């Protein structure tokens, strides 16, 4: 082998050795907070889908609820559908693998849909509190 070829082989071996040294070093993995959910931008639980549209017409609201499913969606829809000021309400789970629901509320003119939705959440919270209380009471009775 000529001197030129030997030099090329030496350079190639040197580069290969350096590459192996780099590859063998532990790679720094990005630290991810256990509570961080990549589906939720900025850890928001709710987000108005089109804030400008809602500002122009507060009786129409489309909301994204992150980390929620049919349990809360159907409960809220049921409460809202019984309210006189609500003209339309419904929800949709965009995809079974996405941990969010889209919720739509339309109220009569002059009535703020977000305020009506807040009342519905309060009602659902009261219902779930009552259920929990009755469950705990029954459990305590069964243990004695």
From Swiss-Prot:
Q: Name one GO biological process term.
A: transcription by RNA polymerase III
Q: Where is this region: Disordered?
A: 14-47
Give the location in the cell: Nucleus
Q: Which domain of life is it from?
A: Eukaryota
Ranges that cross the membrane: none
GO terms of molecular function? DNA binding; DNA-directed RNA polymerase activity; protein dimerization activity
Q: Which residues form the signal peptide?
A: none
Q: Give the InterPro entries listed for this entry.
A: RBP11-like, RBP11-like_dimer, RNA_pol_Rpb11_13-16kDa_CS, RNAP_AC19, Rpo11-like
Q: What is its main location?
A: nucleus
Skewed-composition ranges (Acidic residues): 18-38
Please name the HAMAP family in this protein's record: RNApol_arch_Rpo11 (MF_00261)
* Function text: DNA-dependent RNA polymerase catalyzes the transcription of DNA into RNA using the four ribonucleoside triphosphates as substrates. Common core component of RNA polymerases I and III which synthesize ribosomal RNA precursors and small RNAs, such as 5S rRNA and tRNAs, respectively.
UniProt name for this protein: Probable DNA-directed RNA polymerases I and III subunit RPAC2
* Source species: Caenorhabditis elegans
Designated gene of the protein: rpac-19
